[in-house]
């Protein structure tokens, strides 16, 4: 019977142990997996559906900024790394909740002094147990601290997801801007080529000098050089966009990108400035992460204060000595005589003060970032509106020149010059629009709330409507 009990206890002990399973890292296999990523992944389609972007066709025929952002959230290696930190923090909660294991010791002793009968062995056999008992609620304090640190890791995951979104938006805007500028410059090159041919024709007819022809040729070559530079930037921004999405550049070969999102910009008057700043100061992801870390420092201080009270160790034991059964029960505690844990308490208190100072400094930085971003956005929007008015006037002027040309009042060279002026105004308009999008992106980064809805109007960034939702989850299996 006793052997069966020992066998059952041994099996329970072995069954509770975790076995080691090797997971070798193969660089070649990992590289193949990264290079084979495609935008028509069935898992990505399910991810889009879960986020309310159910495609009518698969693969999608057109991808807008919202779609590409979801692709990045699905594929991003940065998010995968941060999820491992979240999983590590969750494991830390398990570690914090563990109770100390009891210990068992066995001993033998030889009693050579006492004269015992011949049939009595001089050897004594015994065993001791050590049962540690934590006091002052230390286990609960450790669990709360670990939960606060896990909460900070989860907010850091959200911060990483926001950074992924921001990076995709920034590179998407740069890519679209490059496409539009290239198209505009292609038209300018075509117009300047026609102007050069007109001057060549006039020079052959003796109606102009070679200086005019050479100046037109220089202007044409300058436009071509600028076009080459813009096309190079466009290609580089395409690669950068693919990298921001966690895809190889070739994955975008069959992707048709919708550029309509770039044209959306809310009026500064539509932005609820008090709500914007308040939301940033109280609900930004890094603010909430700092709050969790401060709460963890509070629990760490509480734990060090609790460590003033020593843990108790119960020590029941049994010995068999020359036919006598000896039972024992004792306990031990460390004596807080030489120190009462003053050093660790002082360190924990200063760490809490440091966490408070870091939180206050972060809030001040956020406040300045929001105010600066708002000022830059208003200025960029004012410049953009001025360029938009100028573009409308330039279009009207070009139409007037077209009518005059049709009536024979101006020559073709004047018509082409008006087209060049219109293209130059469009180039300035595109640059102003790019600047608006950049400053809007900076403002959104300052608040960490999307400020443009599908209608292009400003959104209320109150935490009740936006920030209490948690859009960043682990959707990609490991």
What is each of the regions a protein language model found here?
Residues 18, 139, 148, 155-279, ...:
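Periplasmic alpha-helical coiled-coil/stalk elements that build and connect Gram-negative outer-membrane
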Residues 203-207, 405-409, 446, 450:
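A short glycine-centered flexible hinge/capping loop motif at secondary-structure junctions
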Residues 344-386, 390:
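C-terminal structural cap/anchor segments
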Residues 230, 285, 432:
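Metallo-beta-lactamase
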Residues 51-61, 93, 105-135, 142, ...:
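Small/polar, glycine/serine/threonine/aspartate-rich low-complexity segments that form flexible
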Residues 73-81, 87-102, 115-119, 127-145, ...:
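A glycine-/polar-enriched beta->alpha junction
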Residues 69, 126-128, 172, 277, ...:
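Membrane-embedded beta-strand positions in outer-membrane beta-barrel channels/transporters
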Residues 1-71, 231-279, 442-478:
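Terminal intrinsically disordered/low-complexity segments used for targeting and assembly
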